[in-house]
Design a protein with these regions (language model features):
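Junction motif at the cytosolic side of a transmembrane helix
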Residues: 235-256
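Secretory targeting signals
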Residues: 18, 22-76, 101-170, 176, ...
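Juxtamembrane non-transmembrane "cap" segments at the membrane-aqueous interface
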Residues: 190-213
Length: 256
């Protein structure tokens, strides 16, 4: 398994797609910060060029990395069945479970690289270009990131699992959007009327990372409290576990 993990590390970290994705994420963040700075220079009394506004705005968009987790999952397994690379791995005697788990491990490492670069650029750029609102908003952003990481990993593993279930890049993406985004969104809407749906939605990944409640002070997120933070972690770990089980089941039944 170690050798296969090394080969996957080499493959993913020597492909342009990872660096294009990371660069695009960093560029979007810097353009956002740069736009706020430009507005503060050319607009009188522009009050949004602060780290409070910038960091809180991006903390309110934690569902965007969930979509990006599907992109990362696709990078890890894209066209593997089409070009028979999965067949070659199995033919060399690598157990199917190890193939899947190795891709999960390397996908987590690649995701960590992308996240580290992007968040470092965000925080550094925020302090360089914008008015410093204090450490509280930086810590809140970091706390939100930590709370959502398990959910993002679950999103990546879900795409990888669905690829082996469907055998198609396009089909796996559509099914991912259905079960990760569409169905939980509908459940969340029904939760406005039915208590059971509200309780169920509170454990689903997409509503959990996208829920934002305006307050008198500023914004409140699911992870703002200790109990909410723990619940986000638990939901993410449950999602990871379920989709790993699904992925192993699917890869075992996949014909060569």
């Amino acid at each position: 398994m170690t050798n296969y993990i090394k080969s996957e590390f080499y493959r993913i970290f020597h492909t342009k797609a990872l660096y294009i994705m990371t660069g695009a994420c960093l560029m979007v963040v810097l353009l956002f910060l740069g736009g706020l700075w430009v507005m503060s220079v050319f607009t009188v009394d522009f009050r949004w060029a602060t780290t409070k506004y910038a960091f809180s705005t991006l903390e309110a968009d934690m569902h965007i990395p969930l979509y990006l987790s599907a992109v990362m999952g696709s990078l890890m397994v894209s066209n593997e069945l089409k070009y028979k690379t999965f067949n070659n791995s199995v033919a060399f005697g690598i157990p199917r479970e190890q193939v899947f788990l190795s891709k999960v491990i390397v996908g987590m490492a690649a995701s960590a690289f992308c996240l580290l670069v992007t968040e470092t650029g965000l925080i550094s750029g925020g302090y360089l270009l914008l008015e410093n609102s204090g450490a509280a908003y930086t810590l809140s952003l970091l706390k939100g990131t930590a709370a959502c990481i398990p959910a993002w990993i679950a999103g990546m593993v879900a795409l990888m699992s669905l690829y082996y279930v469907t055998g198609s890049n396009n089909a796996s993406i559509w099914v991912w959007l259905l079960i990760i985004v569409a169905v939980p969104t509908v459940v969340g809407i029904l939760g406005m009327r039915f208590g059971f749906c509200a309780r169920l939605a509170s454990w689903l990944l997409y509503p959990m990372v996208s829920s934002v409640t305006p307050t008198e002070e500023w914004l409140e997120f699911n992870w703002s409290t200790a109990a909410g933070f723990l619940k986000c972690q638990e939901a993410g770990v449950i999602g990871i576990s379920l989709f790993i089980v699904l992925g192993i089941w699917a890869i075992r039944r996949r014909e060569l």
